[in-house]
Amino acid sequence: MKTSIVERPAQHWVGYRLQGPWQETVPQGFAQLKDWVARHALQGEWMAIYYGNPQVVPPQELSVETVLTVPADFALAVGEGIQHGTLAGGHYFHTCTEVQNNDFFSAWNAFFAQLQQRSDWQVDDRPCYEHYLSDGSQSGNWLLNMYIPVRPV
């Protein structure tokens, strides 16, 4: 797995925040977002922003934002039922990987193991996120960028 430290800009987004087990909330959130995006003919980067450590937080307390990036000046119409937010920029530990058979858990575990081998960076309190480069919703196979927020030790 090839990894690097990258500097990412802040990214504005529209999307849905859901709470509960990620294997349920991520597909649900993207289904909602896909419908909303189709009605508004928007284009952007599809991402999932994760809140909570699944090794210590019970599944029902995990949160995810399923989002599409938008320009900074994007304005939502009142009553749309969708949220608008900003993903913080800064340093991130990055990899581009292929997930097979929807096994995101193994991909994240391997990615975190790579970061733990480094002594010069540590995880900070911003959320981890995925940027999808392909739609694997039918096949279960995904190409994506994964990002872990970091700060120097």
From Swiss-Prot:
Its main location: cytoplasm. One of its GO terms (molecular function) is DNA topoisomerase type II (double strand cut, ATP-hydrolyzing) inhibitor activity. It is found in: Cytoplasm. Keywords: Cytoplasm, Stress response. Pfam families: GyrI-like. GO terms for cellular component: cytoplasm. Inhibits the supercoiling activity of DNA gyrase. Acts by inhibiting DNA gyrase at an early step, prior to (or at the step of) binding of DNA by the gyrase. It protects cells against toxins that target DNA gyrase, by inhibiting activity of these toxins and reducing the formation of lethal double-strand breaks in the cell. Belongs to the DNA gyrase inhibitor family. Interacts with DNA gyrase. This is DNA gyrase inhibitor.
